[in-house]
Amino acid sequence: DSAAALQRAAQMAARGASSAGVDSASISKTETETETETETETETDTDSEHKGSGPKAWIFTSATLGDDAQLDWFAKPLGLDAATRAVVSSPFDFSTQAALWVPRDLPKPTDPGHALVLARRVSQWVVPLQGRTMVLTTSLRALGIIAETLREALSGQNIEVLVQGESSKHALLSRFRSYGDAVSQRQQRSEGEVTANGAVLVASVSFWEGVDLPGDALQLVVLDKLPFPVPDDPLTQARARRITERGLSPFTEQVLPDTAIALKQGAGRLIRSERDRGVLVIGDQRLVTMGYGRRLMQALPNMQRLETEADMLAYLHGVITKTSTTG
């Protein structure tokens, strides 16, 4: 009611006033939804003194602590200048297991029609694969357009389109994974649980990492655009100001490294075991036309580069053939 709304507004104002004294190394942000407000305070930079005094052992491990040998993207903001770094090579042979294609004939990423055109192209690629495709978007708007377009285009192809937000993440991944498991698929068909031949999963930010789909379930990953950070995010803006104060370029020091890590995470959904094969399509020609594209390309595994759509379809045909003979 109105009284409760006024009370919440007063509480938010009080929190805002108290956070006005926070120093420039941190940022306070309040996010409001229909019934809840969430306030978070995040440090934009961490000096080594904040790690406390006395002997301590800190071990950080991840596939995406950085895209360079020094792992500066992770180490610098935490003040880990003296830390020992170790980079372990991937066990996967990406040059033979995966290929990359960047279409040059799509609308520019800033064009309002980009998502629609990309979705129509994807609908043609997934039919011979019988699904086995994940489309990762950089915005919820693109997610909605691509999901709707794919459902219309694939309505007669017996391919299910799974969409983030229509079920839990666990449920979506379980259903998608079931299509790649031939034994599970036959069993579920006999029980009337699976009616389609395959599936396409359309998802956004939360699926760019932490998704593990080894085997035949996933053989085509499509990233709609380069995952640049949202420019009006308060944390992004605060960090940019800190970098500018040091006389450095926020684009070079922050935007490109953040984008490289996100790109690496999204691409990492494709190959999850030594037996996997597949194609990564990035629907953003800036990767090959802009000067910074080379920097971002270095974040990707050493995959075979495909030049044309015909090359991509031929590669997919090889993936399908190998799957049918070994499945």
Predicted feature residues:
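ASCE RecA-like P-loop NTPase motor cores
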Residues: 1-32, 42-327
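Intrinsically disordered, low-complexity repeat regions of secreted/extracellular protein precursors
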Residues: 35-39
